From Swiss-Prot:
Gene3D superfamilies: Impact, N-terminal domain (3.30.230.30), Ubiquitin Conjugating Enzyme (3.10.110.10). Belongs to the IMPACT family. It is found in: Cytoplasm. Translational regulator that ensures constant high levels of translation upon a variety of stress conditions, such as amino acid starvation, UV-C irradiation, proteasome inhibitor treatment and glucose deprivation. Plays a role as a negative regulator of the EIF2AK4/GCN2 kinase activity; impairs GCN1-mediated EIF2AK4/GCN2 activation, and hence EIF2AK4/GCN2-mediated eIF-2-alpha phosphorylation and subsequent down-regulation of protein synthesis. This is Protein IMPACT. The Impact locus is imprinted. Paternal inherited gene is expressed, while the maternal inherited gene is silenced. In contrast with most imprinted genes, neighboring genes are apparently not imprinted. Keywords: Actin-binding, Cytoplasm, Differentiation, Neurogenesis, Phosphoprotein, Repressor, Stress response, Translation regulation. It comes from the Eukaryota. PROSITE patterns: RWD, UPF0029. GO terms for molecular function: actin binding; protein sequestering activity; ribosome binding.
Amino acid sequence: MAEEEVGNSQRQSEEIEAMAAIYGEEWCVIDENAKIFCIRVTDFMDDPKWTLCLQVMLPSEYPGTAPPSYQLNAPWLKGQERADLSNSLEEIYVHNMGESILYQWVEKIRDALIQKSQITEPDPDVKKKTEEVEVESEEDPILEHPPENPVKTLDLKISEETQPETEELPPVAHGVPITDRRSTFQAHVAPVVCPEQVKLVLAKLYENKKIASATHNIYAYRIFCEDKQTFLQDCEDDGETAAGGRLLHLMEILNVKNVMVVVSRWYGGILLGPDRFKHINNCARNILVEKNFTNTPDESTKNLGKKKVKKDKKKNDH
């Protein structure tokens, strides 16, 4: 390793240690080996109006001769507003070339959020949007045949006030991450027998700062209602267009029941096209097989306390 790279590596380590000390749990390690990190930045209010996740990758040349690669993740950030904020970060690099700049980037973003909170209110209907255009795959038959009838999504607001207390939190297992061109995918699985447990699982996952800061958290679940001999099922794209429906279709093909799967994706700045759907479904398939949901789905729910489940405006699939 060249002397300059050794110096950069040491300076990176010192900067990462400082960022973790300053920002605590808000600073998350996505991939330590690839030097990918993220931080959730807010407008510093007790009840933040505006939040943005900054994801950075530190190349070996940083901070000496190259800037960090970065991704700004926020459902409301687009158009000229995104361009202006990106220009501000790049100006900081130009004016501080050769120096460590992550702290300056974070505080510049925070200043922008504080200024925005003083003049505008967030749109309650804003949704996350994928950074990639929809591209159909010609290779994976699962991707070629999404569910014929799109399912409506649950209104799952994750807050202490709305979390049900009568249901038991199911055990949640985490799969092995898949990384491709800086994007990382990881599946999480849990046995569920009612929508309330779906909410509990999501709330538990979102307690993890790394999972909460993912670009997308796609999920689907299938619950078998024995009294009606039908399935209660639902899915959520979380901005990754059509990914939730494709995930649910995979679960239908595998004929799993009483289970939910969440796939977290951390976008690395390089478009993957249709490969992203393959990684999402492969993560899900692997953990369903590993945890034996494809073989003996009933076994995982024996001790969870079954109850009658109402339709509650969800799709019932015979």
